[in-house]
Amino acid sequence: MGVFESIFGSANKKELKKIEPIIKKIESYDKSMQQLSDDELKHKTVEFKERLKNGETLDDILPEAFAVVREASYRVLGMKQYRVQLIGGVVLHQGRIAEMKTGEGKTLVATLPAYLNALSGKGVHVVTVNDYLAKRDKEWMGKVHEFLGLTVGVIVYGLDNDERRENYACDITYGTNNQYGFDYLRDNMVIYKKDKVQRGLNFAIVDEVDSILIDEARTPLIISGQGDESTDMYMRANMFANGLTGRIMDPEEDKPDIFDREFKDETVDFLVDEKRKTASLTEVGTRKAEEYFGVENLSDPNNMELAHHINQALKANNTMKRDIDYVVKDDEILIVDEFTGRIMEGRRYSDGLHQAIEAKEGVEVKSESKTLATVTFQNYFRMYNKLSGMTGTAKTEEAEFNEIYKMDVVEIPTNKPVARVDEQDRVYINENAKFNAIVEEIKEIHKTGQPILVGTISIEVSERLSNLLKKNGIKHDVLNAKQHEREAEIVAQAGMFDKVTIATNMAGRGTDILLGGNPDFMAKHDMKKQGYGDYVIESLDSFLPSTDEELVAARNVYNELHKKYKKMTDENKKKVLEVGGLYIIGTERHESRRIDNQLRGRSGRQGDPGRSRFFVSLGDNLMRLFGGETIQKYAESGKFPEDEPMEFRTITKAIERAQTKVESNNFGIRKNVLKYDDVMNAQRKVIYTERDKVLDGEDMHESIVAMIKDIISNAIDTYCQDPKSENWEMEALMTYLNTFIPEGTLDLTRLNSYNKKTFTDYVIQKALEVYNAKEEAIGKEKFREIERVILLMVVDRKWMDHIDAMDQLRQGIGLRAFGQQDPVRAYNNEGFEMFEDMNHSIKEDTVRGMFNVQPVEEIERKQVAHETSATGGEEEINKPVVKGKKIGRNDPCPCGSGKKYKNCCGKNR
């Protein structure tokens, strides 16, 4: 049985047993593949495509196709997929999640299902978390696919539409979740079909699937246009909020209104709920607000906008912490990702919160933007025909993957047994005692030379610990959002002998910590000191060949330095192995067990030894907010000395319960987000389908004729309700009809001879006569294009307004819960009514536009709004700028592609 005997849950064992015969079949081709020439191996791709055309399925050809990729990987990269990697490949092909530990070679695994599914000709998207990894994997693994005759593309920030279209047309495309999502939204804003860049959503392989489909699931992708609202109110609301007094709610208090019932004599103006990160006015505060802003009733619907500004100012000042939730850099507010600790370049908080923080910090307040298009990652990725993913940590969230995405998780055995020892948590009575214990632990371990990686959950904690280590004379590196430029370098060297590294959660997804150090980074650092430019250094380890003499010479220097440092790091690694590998210290438990497991997983890769331990205090946020009565009882007892750890099974259980409680809460929040977005998603599909009909050049004439009939019928139903024609509201009806039917078209002298039905038929007939005459005057073909142009313009304008209206509805809908009404159901019902109103409004404006159109020489489609920003993830807005010497036509391109400037970014200059 081999690896299949690894200890997994019985359900997981069953899944692995089912896959075992497939793995044996793949391995049975090994010898025959080795005997093929390169050309014969490449020809297998042609053969597979032919077999698919003749009726075989992807499952039929899987064993042989995987064997082909395995052999090609060895010939091209010198790497051959292990047995456990073959298991991972099968799981991915089946549309499931492969949980593979850090260092098990997930990148190489993805080549197997990517190749197999690309044979169908429908495209495969490999999804990574940043542009660097997308480019690296395209150049690295792409060589295997290209060797086998497939085309490989990459989608990164800065490509124009033609380049994007070309890369999406490839058999396999690498890119980030943000790039794929934004391109989907932009494709549904284009006014000509030829401007679309994507070609359908067939199969996606998502790397770090938990990060993308869970951690980022609450953040919608938003494409915005510039709003025109004044920013003065943010400043006024901030000044008002700064003059108030408040208190933090006890974790057991449920709702702010309890305060006003039970603490009438208190005079605080607002309450802060740390659990939910919200702040709200009390009755006392509400009266102050009404007096300050000169309004009679803050709860009046006319004052909804003012109340919203006040709430956001309270939230900004009392729940959003500088250097934890965001940093201030160059007079800008930059968001810090709570899961990774990275700065999220280009992203802004929505709903006015970003502006409220700008007002709080005294930087320029930028006006709110208008949403042009939006989608959540949940609904974007559920549109793929097949979805799969890989990560080192997914099992704890299996229920969510199953419920939301219909994907189960299969734990893949490690190639070598995990040798890392995960020690029992050390729990202290308060934070000071905990940090003192951490420093003492680091001092003791540091004496042995064992490398230490200390994981923190915020910039604030990392800097506090750094100051303590400085006082104790311990040399160390600090990695947090303020030093994110050096992230890869610091993480890569964290495994060196005698090294101490403090890192926020950003600690290295995508960058392996190699015991003994990373010779690649050492060689590059040396070359920087020698004066080589950034663009040359970025191209050194490109997998693309180059004919540029300067770059070839630089690569030769790099190879020599790499050999030198490899020898040094190999010796260093021996010393690290002797002292037990990398020691991981967690400074507190994260809300999610998965994030804790990710930190632990930095140590013990590929069978290396290692250790991990978490230090916890009863004052940590997790324990304070979610620990419950058990933790509170211990914290208030006063029985325990500060300098000794508390070793009680009840505390360990309380930590586990707290994490489970938070994970459950967060799952509930994400499910709730999805319930709301599902309403928008259904509407989005209708609009995008109608847009596609226009873009595909469909004849919209019958649709517009139907609109004319609907508009007239609805108008007559509204104004002619009485059975007797003399009681009809003819003046109002004619005022309405004359907005599109010219005056004098209708003969009303015989009105008494009509009933409502015959009158409706008469008005429709006369309207269509006018419409057909207009078509004849303009010409049929030109008139058909005018119909498409006007319909597209009206749909886009109305849809963008509707997105904002639905967003406002959602912001206010939560209050319905106080009236015993299900907010989601209310949102669904009212959203449907608003959607129907929008559809009616689209018909009215389209009909008016068509009746009032004048003969023109040329009719041109125009976008109703232009994108100013795309937010929702790590959008790499600041492209590197090369200063100093002008780039020559034959110089290496500064983008790092390895090509000459004239053949890359300079080809259109």
From Swiss-Prot:
Keywords from the UniProt entry: ATP-binding, Cell membrane, Cytoplasm, Membrane, Metal-binding, Nucleotide-binding, Protein transport, Translocase, Translocation, Transport, Zinc
Cofactor: Zn(2+)
Subcellular localization(s) per the UniProt record: Cell membrane; Cytoplasm
InterPro entries: Helicase_ATP-bd (IPR014001), P-loop_NTPase (IPR027417), SEC_C_motif (IPR004027), SecA (IPR000185), SecA_CS (IPR020937), SecA_DEAD (IPR011115), SecA_motor_DEAD (IPR014018), SecA_preprotein_X-link_dom (IPR011130)
EC number(s) recorded for this UniProt protein: 7.4.2.8
One CC-aspect GO term: cytosol
Enzyme class: translocase
Protein name as catalogued: Protein translocase subunit SecA
